[in-house]
Each structure stands twice: as C-alpha cells, then as structure tokens.
C-alpha cells in the first residue's frame, strides 16, 4: 500500500485525501462505490484539487448514466474537453458498454479501426461474453495513452461493473483463441475464397482482425500492469454510513485486494451533524445510526485515510460549489459549534 499521511499528535491516519495529492507518481485514480453515494461529486472535487498540483488532469466518466456534464453544467462527450474555468483540467464521458456497435458500423462501411470485419466482428461479439466492453475499453485506453495527461481520474459505474476492466485481458485472450480456432477450422475453405490481396470477396480479412485484437490486447495488458502498481494507481472508495453501502465497500475492498490494486482512502459522504438539544427526532435518530456505522468503518479500516464529509443543504453542482466541496477533501470538516 502507498504511504498515507500520519497525524503525529494521535498517531491516526489523516482524515483527508492529501496523501493522494502528495503522491506525485500516481497516474491512474479510480473513484467508485455503490450507486447514489456521491462518487461523481467526489471524483470532480478530487480532480479540482489535483489540477492545483499537477500539470494536466483528465477526468473520465465510465458510468453509462453520465453525471459529469450535470456536475459542471457543461456538455461533455467522447472527446476530451477543457472544463470551463480551468486551464489544465479536462473531462470526457465514454460508455464502455456498447461501442462494439459503432465498431461494427465502421466495419460495414469500410472505415475506422474495424474496416472490413463486419460480420466476423458480430460473430465474435456474440461468441465471447464481454468482448464488446473489452475492445471499447481498450480503444479508450489507447486514446488516453496517446494524450499527455499527467493524471487520469475515472468516475466509475456503480459497484459490480467497476472492476470488469480487470477481466478484460482474459476476455481478449479468449477472443484471440476463438479467432485462431476459426482460422484453423475454416482455413482450407478460406484459402479457396481468398483473393489476390489476401481478403475475402466481401473485404473481410482474418489476419487483419487478429492483428488488431493483438494490438488491443497488448495495450490493455500494459495498462493492466500499471493498475497493479501502487506507485501508479490507487482506488478511492466512496460510501455513506449505512449498512448496504458499508457492505458494498467491504466487498469492493476485498476484490481490489485480490487483484492487487492499492486502496487506502475512503470518503464517507452525507454525514449529519445536528446541534445539541435539536428537537428534530429524525435527524437525531439518523445521526445515531450513522455514528454506529462510522465507528464500524473506523474500526475496520484503521489503516485507511477516512474522510468525513457532511450532508449539505444545497446540491453540489457547478464550479463554485464543487470547489468549496473539494476543500473539505483536504481540510477536515469541522461541524458548527454545538454540533454532535
């Protein structure tokens, strides 16, 4: 695990994300958790803080229900675009689920990276579960690698989909094996159909497809290796102090550990701090429940930086509110006088 900041006064890990800002070697940062816990707000806020201490930062949403555009009140798409008001912070929204359709569209039209492989691509997509996500994710990584961003932050899909990319090298290996099997099985028949340029009459080319798959596999294997390097990659878990969210967080941390991916920070959102003597029974009851789960989080993850974020009265949208929220990720929130 990466070295986290220690508070020497009480020998507790500092309750901030300052350790991530201080670790200059980090290239990939993933922000994930259960749906509705504030992942996007947290990833946007972390990106804002990182932009202050990095040459260039890219924020990527891989959640099909994209929220970056809403968070910054600015439309983003598949191409990286500078966020208004920043000179070194860009964002893009991609959908790792379904871009195989686009790839197949290019194949049928005879253009793009899949030119001349339409029917074969479709057969392959149906033959191997997950190949569409694997190939589209690999294409995204190729694009990101060609750009010169110092740090890349992923605002991920809800838990369950978040770690699929870890299986992609295996999926692509299966794809290559399938293509190889097709080549062996139908080789003699294909030889009789091949034209002078080594292509089928309809323009499909088996060798071309294998080369492209191999190229994607190499790209994703290289990045996958970087993901397992604690000097280059870390995962920030986001949760709220409730049973299901805590359960999902524990499951995710266990899974990250099994894939050797570093994680040492947890952001706990939506904390209530009712004033002493408050006559709001619901507030007090909820705070009591939150306190119980917060104590469990601190006990379970005593080697983590646990960041406690308050429930705010206003929605965190727009540059100014995100900047204000982001300050609390690096300066511990202090409840108003009289808060519990």
Curated annotation (Swiss-Prot):
<keyword id="KW-0862">Zinc</keyword>
<dbReference type="GO" id="GO:0009408">
    <property type="term" value="P:response to heat"/>
</dbReference>
<feature type="binding site">
    <location>
        <position position="269"/>
    </location>
    <ligand>
        <name>ATP</name>
    </ligand>
</feature>
<keyword id="KW-0256">Endoplasmic reticulum</keyword>
<dbReference type="GO" id="GO:0005085">
    <property type="term" value="F:guanyl-nucleotide exchange factor activity"/>
</dbReference>
<dbReference type="GO" id="GO:0000750">
    <property type="term" value="P:pheromone-dependent signal transduction involved in conjugation with cellular fusion"/>
</dbReference>
<keyword id="KW-0547">Nucleotide-binding</keyword>
<feature type="active site">
    <location>
        <position position="63"/>
    </location>
</feature>
<feature type="binding site">
    <location>
        <position position="242"/>
    </location>
    <ligand>
        <name>ATP</name>
    </ligand>
</feature>
<dbReference type="GO" id="GO:0071816">
    <property type="term" value="P:tail-anchored membrane protein insertion into ER membrane"/>
</dbReference>
<feature type="binding site">
    <location>
        <begin position="34"/>
        <end position="41"/>
    </location>
    <ligand>
        <name>ATP</name>
    </ligand>
</feature>
<dbReference type="GO" id="GO:0051082">
    <property type="term" value="F:unfolded protein binding"/>
</dbReference>
<comment type="function">
    <text>ATPase required for the post-translational delivery of tail-anchored (TA) proteins to the endoplasmic reticulum. Recognizes and selectively binds the transmembrane domain of TA proteins in the cytosol. This complex then targets to the endoplasmic reticulum by membrane-bound receptors, where the tail-anchored protein is released for insertion. This process is regulated by ATP binding and hydrolysis. ATP binding drives the homodimer towards the closed dimer state, facilitating recognition of newly synthesized TA membrane proteins. ATP hydrolysis is required for insertion.</text>
</comment>
<keyword id="KW-0067">ATP-binding</keyword>
<dbReference type="GO" id="GO:0042802">
    <property type="term" value="F:identical protein binding"/>
</dbReference>
<dbReference type="InterPro" id="IPR025723">
    <property type="entry name" value="Anion-transp_ATPase-like_dom"/>
</dbReference>
<comment type="subunit">
    <text>Homodimer.</text>
</comment>
<dbReference type="GO" id="GO:0006890">
    <property type="term" value="P:retrograde vesicle-mediated transport, Golgi to endoplasmic reticulum"/>
</dbReference>
<keyword id="KW-0813">Transport</keyword>
<comment type="similarity">
    <text>Belongs to the arsA ATPase family.</text>
</comment>
<dbReference type="GO" id="GO:0043529">
    <property type="term" value="C:GET complex"/>
</dbReference>
<dbReference type="InterPro" id="IPR027542">
    <property type="entry name" value="ATPase_ArsA/GET3_euk"/>
</dbReference>
<keyword id="KW-0963">Cytoplasm</keyword>
<feature type="binding site">
    <location>
        <position position="280"/>
    </location>
    <ligand>
        <name>Zn(2+)</name>
    </ligand>
</feature>
<dbReference type="InterPro" id="IPR016300">
    <property type="entry name" value="ATPase_ArsA/GET3"/>
</dbReference>
<dbReference type="GO" id="GO:0010038">
    <property type="term" value="P:response to metal ion"/>
</dbReference>
<dbReference type="GO" id="GO:0016887">
    <property type="term" value="F:ATP hydrolysis activity"/>
</dbReference>
<dbReference type="Pfam" id="PF02374">
    <property type="entry name" value="ArsA_ATPase"/>
</dbReference>
<dbReference type="GO" id="GO:0034599">
    <property type="term" value="P:cellular response to oxidative stress"/>
</dbReference>
<keyword id="KW-0378">Hydrolase</keyword>
<dbReference type="GO" id="GO:0044183">
    <property type="term" value="F:protein folding chaperone"/>
</dbReference>
<dbReference type="GO" id="GO:0046872">
    <property type="term" value="F:metal ion binding"/>
</dbReference>
<protein>
    <recommendedName>
        <fullName>ATPase get3</fullName>
        <ecNumber>3.6.-.-</ecNumber>
    </recommendedName>
</protein>
<feature type="binding site">
    <location>
        <position position="283"/>
    </location>
    <ligand>
        <name>Zn(2+)</name>
    </ligand>
</feature>
<keyword id="KW-0479">Metal-binding</keyword>
<dbReference type="GO" id="GO:0005524">
    <property type="term" value="F:ATP binding"/>
</dbReference>
<dbReference type="InterPro" id="IPR027417">
    <property type="entry name" value="P-loop_NTPase"/>
</dbReference>
<dbReference type="GO" id="GO:0006620">
    <property type="term" value="P:post-translational protein targeting to endoplasmic reticulum membrane"/>
</dbReference>
């Amino acid at each position: 695990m990466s070295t986290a900041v220690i508070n020497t006064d009480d020998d507790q890990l500092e309750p901030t994300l300052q350790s991530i800002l201080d670790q200059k070697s980090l290239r990939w940062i993933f922000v994930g958790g259960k749906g509705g816990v504030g992942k996007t707000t947290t990833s946007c806020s972390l990106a804002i803080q990182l932009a202050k201490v990095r040459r260039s930062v890219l924020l990527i949403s891989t959640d099909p229900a994209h929220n970056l555009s809403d968070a910054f009140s600015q439309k983003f798409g598949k191409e990286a675009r500078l966020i208004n008001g920043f000179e070194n912070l860009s964002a893009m929204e991609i959908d790792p689920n379904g871009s195989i359709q686009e790839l197949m569209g290019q194949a049928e039209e005879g253009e793009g990276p899949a030119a001349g492989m339409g029917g074969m691509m479709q057969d392959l997509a149906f033959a191997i579960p997950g190949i569409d996500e694997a190939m589209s994710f690999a294409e995204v990584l190729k694009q990101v690698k060609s750009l010169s961003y110092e740090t890349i932050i992923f605002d991920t899909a809800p838990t369950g989909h978040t770690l699929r990319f870890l299986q992609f090298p295996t999926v692509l290996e299966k794809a290559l094996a399938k293509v190889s099997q097709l080549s062996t099985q139908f080789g003699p028949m294909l030889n009789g159909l091949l034209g002078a340029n080594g292509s089928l009459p309809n323009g499909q080319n088996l060798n071309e497809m294998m080369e492209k798959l191999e190229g994607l596999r190499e790209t994703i294997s290289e990045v996958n290796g970087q993901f397992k390097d604690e000097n280059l990659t870390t995962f920030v878990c986001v949760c709220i102090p409730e049973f299901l969210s805590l359960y999902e967080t524990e499951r995710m941390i266990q899974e990250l550990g099994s894939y050797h991916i570093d994680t040492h920070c947890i952001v706990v959102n939506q904390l209530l701090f009712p004033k002493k003597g408050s006559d709001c029974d619901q507030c007090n009851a909820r705070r009591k429940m939150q306190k119980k789960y917060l104590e469990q989080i601190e006990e379970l993850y005593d080697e983590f930086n646990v960041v406690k974020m308050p429930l705010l009265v206003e929605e965190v949208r727009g540059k100014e509110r995100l900047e204000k929220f982001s300050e609390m990720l690096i300066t511990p929130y202090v409840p108003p006088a009289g808060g519990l």
